[in-house]
């Protein structure tokens, strides 16, 4: 008789998708042959992530609740957001009670220093819980940081609980915030790329001028691309400020931002103030195609990739751009220097430095030999160090050890 497959449940409580979901999809790809996989996500989730799940043949179910991930500007908004998070976690816990958690793996996207009550309740059910941390917590008041430290010390002592840092920077910074024995056992499972998808995107038929024109991009311009959510922590206004500086000096440069969600009315009003006109195109990722290969192929419209983030782990979009042979510029924050070695595999600038970003873009435009060097070295470094098949194997091994009580 065939042994039933072990249940592997992935859960997140927000409708947006990004690098965190790409990280989990890599694990699903590697695990789907041997595990019974279920994804639990909010109703109303962006269609692209559902397409990715369908493409992999992954079963999913919806919860009728979602948290707010955008910034809460006022005190009342912050209180509402916290209450919504607590309510969403209560709904999630009630849903999860139908499963044999003692003999399953639960991999959830949550902040363990906030969701300690949920994690405690799951530990009482003898669940095997894994949480990915893509970056260390943002700096806050001494009182709040003390509270976070106490909570992390507590949850790191819960049986069956695991944190998987997706980069070395996050693990290093967690030292002293979690129990020492817990920290020693944490494995780093880097954000990573799928080399087969990268090669497929590079080898597939692609006419750059036609793709550019199809999305309103001048086919003859030097294109600077950013990919990710159009939000503050990704450095969106730094990107636009640098764009204005560059275009004032060289009007043959244009800027493109590929995003899963277009700006709202207030954001568009602020964008207009930069006066970039046709030199800026914000493109909805759904419009370039539904498959991962479609998104990766779109990267090839770019001459240079940049991600001027303030807060970031090890961003998948940056690794993908580098693997696709695109010279890349990003910020020396969190784990980004684990991929970009300044002037060797890319260019590093300080977060918030729009002038530095503009200068780096112009330098690359004027120096094709430097572009070729950074593109070649960047691709080689990513392919050698950030292969998702290796990373997924490490995570799945951790699942198995947890079930074995190790």
Give names to the regions the model predicted.
Residues 158-185, 190-200:
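A short, active-site helix/loop in glycosyltransferases that binds the activated sugar's phosphate group
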Residues 292, 297-302:
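Short alpha-helical donor nucleotide-sugar binding micro-motif in glycosyltransferases
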Residues 310:
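Aromatic "clamp/platform" in nucleotide-sugar-dependent glycosyltransferases that forms part
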Residues 327-330, 340:
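Short hydrophobic beta-strand element within catalytic cores of glycosyltransferases
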């Amino acid at each position: 008789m065939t042994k039933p497959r072990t249940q592997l449940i992935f859960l997140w409580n927000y409708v947006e998708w990004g690098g965190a979901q790409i990280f989990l999809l890599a694990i699903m790809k590697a695990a789907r042959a041997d595990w019974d996989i279920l994804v639990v996500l909010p109703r109303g989730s962006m269609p692209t992530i559902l397409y990715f799940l369908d493409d992999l043949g992954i079963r999913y179910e919806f919860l009728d609740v979602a948290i707010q991930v955008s910034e809460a500007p006022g005190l009342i908004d912050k209180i509402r957001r916290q209450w919504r998070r607590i309510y969403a976690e209560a709904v999630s816990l009630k849903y999860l009670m139908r499963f044999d958690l003692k003999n399953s793996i639960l991999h959830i996207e949550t902040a363990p220093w906030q969701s300690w009550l949920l994690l405690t309740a799951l530990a009482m059910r003898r669940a095997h819980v894994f949480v990915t941390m893509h970056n260390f917590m943002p700096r806050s008041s001494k009182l709040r940081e003390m509270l976070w430290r106490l909570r992390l010390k507590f949850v790191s002592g819960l049986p069956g609980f695991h944190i998987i840092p997706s980069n070395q920077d996050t693990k290093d910074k967690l030292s002293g915030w979690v129990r020492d024995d817990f920290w020693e056992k944490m494995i780093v499972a880097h954000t990573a790329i799928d080399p087969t998808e990268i090669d497929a995107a590079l080898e597939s038929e692609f006419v750059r001028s036609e793709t550019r024109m199809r999305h309103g991009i001048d086919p003859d311009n030097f294109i600077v691309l950013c990919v990710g959510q159009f939000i503050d922590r990704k450095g969106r206004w730094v990107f636009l400020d640098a764009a204005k500086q560059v275009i004032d000096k060289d009007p043959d440069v244009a800027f493109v931002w590929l995003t899963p969600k277009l700006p709202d009315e207030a954001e568009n009003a602020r964008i207009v103030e930069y006066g970039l006109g046709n030199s800026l195109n914000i493109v909805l990722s759904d419009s370039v195609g539904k498959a991962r290969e479609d998104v990766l192929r779109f990267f090839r419209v770019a001459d240079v990739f940049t991600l001027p983030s303030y807060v970031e782990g090890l961003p998948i979009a940056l690794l993908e751009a580098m693997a696709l042979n695109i010279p890349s510029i990003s910020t020396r924050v969190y784990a980004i220097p684990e991929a970009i070695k300044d002037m060797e595999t890319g260019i590093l600038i300080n977060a918030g430095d729009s002038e530095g970003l503009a200068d780096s873009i112009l330098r690359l435009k004027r120096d094709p030999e430097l572009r070729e060097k950074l593109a070649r070295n960047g691709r080689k470094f990513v392919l050698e160090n950030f292969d998702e098949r290796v990373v997924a194997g490490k995570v799945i091994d951790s699942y198995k050890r947890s079930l074995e009580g190790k």
